[in-house]
Curated annotation (Swiss-Prot):
Cofactor note as given: Binds 1 [4Fe-4S] cluster. The cluster is coordinated with 3 cysteines and an exchangeable S-adenosyl-L-methionine.
Protein name, per record: Dual-specificity RNA methyltransferase RlmN
Residues that bind [4Fe-4S] cluster: 113, 117, 120
EC number(s) recorded for this UniProt protein: 2.1.1.192
SUPFAM superfamilies: Radical SAM enzymes (SSF102114)
Gene that encodes it: rlmN
Predominant cellular place of this UniProt entry's protein: cytoplasm
Positions of the Radical SAM core domain: 99-337
Annotated binding of S-adenosyl-L-methionine, by residue: 167-168, 199, 221-223, 300
Length: 370
């Protein structure tokens, strides 16, 4: 029985070196191939011109470099790009957001999500499976190749990665960490730990593991300073409450790359956007002595949600109070809403746990017909 070929795309530098040793080849050959794949975007062994003929033949026999198919890509009028990527009959989305001086790629880690946060459209679509390391890094590979070919008024260079797409990345730790290793490898994409940010809803034990094994920048989806409300809107809080979460955050801030934690706070009208909520948030972060930046995210409504986006006045009042109390506070701009790429809209039109396959196939058929 023929052994399955190893997909080299998802192997970090150590893993690809180990693979080359296992087939009787040298580590420096592994580094050559690693660079061809990620730095140069080459996935055909025959096109890797500095490899010997025998090595290329061996690789074709033992390995492959498989890139998922892009079902479609869209560009927004504001420069935002969105890709729908086929991952074995299901689909995930990847979004690139250009800003002055930077370009941020939002990467997915799971097909669906297990956490079922009450305000998140992805969580309402159910959970299929974790992405492999190859499927995670493929999102950056595809974006880097696509954007390098795009001309226009925007700068299409990926300078930052945020693991904030579909899924809870710390629930797919074993695949996300190797993928982030590749993102930060100088032979690949060369991003620093400060430029790669993982966003978690609060899988506390894995926060400690992340600090030990990766140390990328950390963002935490807090959304409320109140355990009672957080139990309702972020159910994982029932397992790891705010006190436990902030204890982990405090240590991460001390040893991580930024010396602070970014707290994400989705503002929902009359749910968590009152001045009393802002007061409680300030008191909480100051009492726990967690160095913090706060990113306010106005809620993006989707069909069937009971939540509403606050008025601009309520958003401004909340922000002003936090800033007045010494916290660097930003309000996330809605980007790519004309292509359903804004935060909270990821894959909402293609991921449905009752008819995911049918909707995906219809989308694929519509794309092929164009």
């Amino acid at each position: 029985m023929q052994q399955d070929k190893v997909n080299l795309l998802g192997l970090n530098q150590k893993a690809i070196e180990d693979f080359f040793i296992s087939i009787g080849k040298k580590k420096f050959h592994a580094r050559q191939v690693f660079k061809w794949i990620h730095k140069k975007g080459v996935i055909d062994f025959d096109a890797m011109t500095d490899l010997g003929k025998n090595l290329r033949h061996k690789l074709k026999d033992k390995a492959q470099i498989t890139i998922p198919k892009v079902v479609f890509s869209k560009a927004s009028k504001d420069g935002t790009h969105k890709w729908l990527i086929d991952v074995g009959g299901s689909a995930v989305e990847t979004v690139f957001i250009p800003e002055e001086g930077r370009g941020t790629l939002c990467v997915s880690s799971q097909i669906g999500c297990t956490l079922n946060c009450s305000f998140c459209s992805t969580g309402k679509q159910g959970f299929n499976r974790n992405l492999s390391a190859a499927e995670v890094i493929a999102q950056l590979w595809i974006a880097a190749r696509t954007l390098s070919k795009t001309d226009g008024e925007h700068d299409f260079t990926v300078t930052n990665i945020v693991m904030m797409g579909m899924g809870e990345p710390l629930m797919n730790f074993e695949n996300v960490v190797p993928a982030m290793d590749i993102m930060m490898d100088d032979l690949a994409y060369g991003l620093s730990r400060r430029k790669v940010t993982l966003s978690t809803s609060g899988v506390v034990p894995r926060i400690y593991d992340l600090l030990e094994q990766s140390g990328v920048s950390l963002a935490v989806s807090l959304h409320t300073p109140n355990d009672m409300l957080r139990n309702e809107i972020v159910p994982i809080n029932k397992k790891y409450n705010i006190d436990e979460l902030l204890e982990a955050c405090k240590l991460y801030a001390q040893k991580g790359p930024h010396k602070h934690i970014t707290f994400e706070y989705t503002l929902m009208e009359e749910v968590n956007d009152n001045l009393s909520d802002a007061e409680e948030l300030v008191a909480l972060l100051k009492s726990r002595e967690v160095p913090a930046k706060i990113n306010l995210i106005p809620f993006n409504p989707y069909p069937g949600t009971p939540y509403k986006k606050p008025s601009n006045n309520r958003i401004h009042r909340f922000k002003e109070f936090l800033q007045h109390n010494g916290f660097v506070t930003t309000v996330r701009k809605t980007r790519g809403d004309d292509i359903d790429a804004a935060c909270g809209q990821l894959a909402g039109d293609v991921m449905d746990k009752t008819n995911r396959k049918q909707i995906y196939l219809k989308k694929l058929g519509d794309t092929n017909a164009n």
